Design a protein with these regions (language model features):
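A short, acidic, flexible beta-alpha connecting loop/helix-capping segment that sits on the rim
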Residues: 13, 238-259
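Active-site acidic/histidine proton-transfer and metal-coordination neighborhood
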Residues: 52, 71-162, 251, 262
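Acidic-and-aromatic substrate-binding clefts and catalytic sites of carbohydrate-active enzymes
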Residues: 12-18, 32-45, 69, 107-113, ...
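N-terminal pre-domain/capping segments
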Residues: 1-87, 93, 258-286
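Conserved, mostly hydrophobic/aromatic
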Residues: 25, 33, 50, 92, ...
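Acidic/histidine-rich catalytic cores of soluble enzymes
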Residues: 123-218
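Acidic (Asp/Glu)-rich catalytic clusters
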Residues: 1-2, 22-27, 41-61, 87-96, ...
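Hydrophobic faces of well-ordered beta-strands that scaffold small-molecule active sites
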Residues: 4-10, 33-35, 57-62, 100-102, ...
Length: 286
């Protein structure tokens, strides 16, 4: 869109092969894609589909199911986690992808205090990323105290930045204003919506992480846009969405019933509404 480019995260969760999905995204109007790394996927097909469609590959999402193991004192566990992250970093290098998104934790119980093992393991990842000219974007998820520790540990390192997931902020981080804290280090966005924390006692759980289309949840997008405008300017604002409902929930059901072309068109419509807000000045002009 004029004055603000948009992108969308792509993965196998959409039910069509990722290269085909990328081509559909290109025809819809987005300017960039951000694929999810899979160890056994042929990324060359995805990269070629993006090139043919005139889409930038804005970032690569590193594997996240191994995030907790990066803090483990068990060298076998942490070594396997680091191995996968380094493999995904190799993909970034091979295809000139400038940013790799990394989760710092996965899980809601037994979250450890920041420890030397974690700093050492993430340090190895960051060092290799520096060699490759790839930036590491730590994403806000559960375990926000670990995010804070890593962002402080790598403060001043130009190869480490912040990936802001607007939905995670509401359903995992108790609506803490993370852009006020890390907006000057913002290098990637995962924009999406949800209904906040469902439990009255404030306990967080993964089934609240809906990844709805913007404006289908309770997010205040004027507030979000105002905060993004104060943060480091992004060439692309990226949307990370989901067409599948979480177990025993049905908020995303209607998305899955749509033809994929219609869903992507609606996603682009919502992205343009936010891009328009981003491009406006305070007096409403461009």
């Amino acid at each position: 869109m004029w004055k603000q480019k948009t992108g969308i995260s792509v993965s196998n969760s959409y039910g069509v092969p990722v290269p085909e999905l990328v081509r559909l995204v290109g025809r819809t109007g987005f300017d960039a894609v951000s694929p999810e790394w899979e160890e056994n996927d042929d990324f060359a097909e995805t990269a070629e589909a993006a090139r043919e469609s005139g889409l930038a590959i804005q970032s690569l999402h590193g594997p996240f199911d191994i995030a907790a193991k990066m803090w483990s004192a068990d060298k076998d566990d942490s070594g396997e986690a680091l191995r996968k992250l380094l493999l995904s970093l190799e993909t970034c290098k091979q295809y000139s992808i400038p940013v790799m998104v990394v989760h710092v934790w996965m899980g809601f119980d037994n979250i450890p205090a920041p420890n030397s093992e974690g700093f050492e393991n993430f340090g190895k990842l960051v060092k290799k990323a520096e060699e490759y000219g790839v930036k590491i974007a730590f994403e806000n998820t559960e375990g926000d105290e670990l995010l804070f520790a890593l962002m402080e540990h790598f403060d001043g390192n130009g190869n480490v930045g912040f990936c802001w997931d607007s939905g995670h902020e509401m359903c995992y981080n108790h609506s803490m204003d993370l852009l006020a804290r890390f907006g000057d280090r913002l290098i990637m966005t995962h924009l999406n919506d949800n209904l906040g924390i469902s439990r009255f006692d404030g306990k967080t759980y993964w089934t609240d992480d809906l990844h709805l289309l913007p404006f289908d949840g309770i997010a205040d997008w004027d507030y979000n846009v105002a905060r993004m405008k104060k943060a480091k300017k992004q060439e692309y604002i990226n949307f990370e969405l989901n067409i599948r409902s979480k177990p025993n929930r049905h908020e995303n059901d209607a998305y899955g019933e749509m033809p994929i072309e219609r869903y992507l068109t609606e996603a682009y419509n919502r992205a343009c509404r936010i891009a328009y807000k981003m491009a406006q000045t305070d007096n409403g002009c461009f």
